[in-house]
Amino acid sequence: MKKIKIGICGWGTVATALHRSILENKNQIKRTHQVDLEIVAIGARRDNPKYSAGKTKVLRNIFDVLDEDIDVLVELIGGTDDAKTLISSSFEKKIPVVTANKAVIYEYGDILFREASNNGVDFLFEASVCAGTPTINLLKNDLAGNKFLSIKGMLNGTSNFIISQMEDGMSFEDSLSFAQENGYAEADPTFDIEGIDAAHKISILSNIVFGSPLPPNEFLIEGISNITKQDIYIAEKLDFTVKHVSSADMKDGKLLIRSNPALVQKSDYLSSLKNVRNGLVIDTDLIGKIHISGSGAGGEATAAGVISDIVRLASESSNHNATSKEDLKYRQISDELFSFLIIVNSSSENINSDVLDMLAEHNISIRNSGLILSLIHI
């Protein structure tokens, strides 16, 4: 049986859930995976009033964890610069790293992948996208041999939770407050509601699937803060749902990445995912479309992804390190043709005939949703 000694840096929601999960599931992991997990030390600048480390050694200087007898460092401090320095220091000491920190991968991914490779250690980050839902390993290993055509999905549980509440009649502001009260949104929700968190995640997936650099070239990032109850109502009338969708697809040898609100037909798989569910549709040449979904928020779900990476270190095929393509070409969002919706506070009888003729010439159909006229480009 292989023993793995763990050092954890960070002592927030995910770190405490990880500590608890390892202690509670230690015997099961031994039995099913033949791996003995031992938490040697925790790097925490302050105590967590909601959870005690018990008998585990706590070090106030997080970098001191690297001086302990550990086989893997779990980086859960969040942020970018300090996290990058910590991870790089771990690589220099030939200690592999597991992280759930999508921000540091987005900002420094290419540098960290190179450092891990140069030092001959693993850098695993399953929990950085879709928490504990198996995503990174699926793309890196299980789908080897497939050519990826596109990947799209809902990658932020907070945004999906808020939109789900709005579908039930709540305003955006009330939905956000409700999400915060239930622990699904941070006190400062900017990263979630402005699409930044989802943009980080689709960038990581695009790096794995298409080799795009980290950080990536500039692409469309838009959040949900401007969505109104009226938007939700109109979408419902037109047999759509509003979702925050992030995607990366290759067409004619050029890549397009985007992360923005979109109308999704009710018959679409993504439309069925509610509350904090994350979901992905992966399109490949050999086996077609693959649908996956799971909880995208919460300490326990994220801890599950971290544990899967730690256990994977005991195997021979644990490396998640990715490589960017230097000659990758991009498509611009301004060059793309999309269906779109324009809402006009009027009835068709009140619109000038010249306007109607112009719309017809450009294949823009007019549908009346009942109270508000909507225009859909098809």
Regions found by a protein language model. Give the residues of each.
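Rossmann-like NAD(P)H-binding beta-loop-alpha module
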Residues: S117-G120, L124-D197, I204
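Conserved small/polar residues in nucleotide/adenosyl-binding loops
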Residues: I376-I378
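C-terminal, non-catalytic macromolecule-binding modules
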Residues: K289-E336
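Substrate-binding/catalytic subdomain of NAD(P)-dependent oxidoreductase enzymes
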Residues: Q165, L176-S272, R277-G279
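Short glycine-/aliphatic-rich beta-strand segments at the starts of folded cytosolic domains
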Residues: I333-S346
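ADP-ribose/adenylate-binding Rossmann-like module
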Residues: G78, F91-E107
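N-terminal glycine-/serine-/threonine-rich beta1-alpha1-beta2 phosphate-ribose binding loop
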Residues: M1-E92
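Rossmann-fold NAD(P)-binding glycine/threonine-rich loop
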Residues: K84, K102-E126
